Amino acid sequence: MKKIKLMPDYGCFPIWGMDDDNFGNIDPYSLPISKSLAEELLVWSNKYDKTLNIEEPLNSGFENIEKENIFKYEGEKLFKKLKLELGDQYTVIYPS
């Protein structure tokens, strides 16, 4: 069983391989999931990318706690969808 992590990072896909033979950033379209879920994952990741303050990286983050909580809630929903679509083929981790 493959192990992946759902975790946004600036300028990266939101899926990370956690196995020795599948380690690193993974394009959601390369996974056996629906196109619509892959698109949702990328939209979610783009929301995170928009929080980056290039000039002052230490000041990066969401505008307020409400937007951050909404983002986390969306991540939890995507985590559940990802687990459902991948079934027993993958172990999915989401550090909420």
Segment roles from a protein language model:
Residues 1-96:
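Intrinsic low-complexity, intrinsically disordered or marginally ordered coil/linker segments
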